Amino acid sequence: IGLAFQIVDDTLNLRGFKDNLKSKGEDIAAGKVTFPIAKAMSRLPSNERLGLWKTVSSKPTDPAVIAAVIEQLEDCGALDACERQARQLVETAWQRLDPLLRDSRVKVILRAFGWYVLERSY
């Protein structure tokens, strides 16, 4: 669940948080190698990987450069792939945990927490 939370957080940073709680692309401006960046590295041709790496590691502040990086991550499918992977992590964890827990309010809350991790917008 923790890894899924982080993947969703990284993706939200690029797609935008509800009510603009954080600036879109803050992680790029900070030069952070997030899960979507790592995912893009496995999807992009080598020349684009190098360009992405150089851009992110330079900690860009120009909104146009940050927007171009986000567009590149969208275009290569990295953000959608991250969301699918987060969903799969939560579903797999639940499949393993479900038979071990007796039906209870706590079990329902735990399941709801897993859904929240995936569906949150802030």
What role is predicted for each listed range?
Residues 1-122:
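All-alpha prenyltransferase/terpene-synthase fold signal
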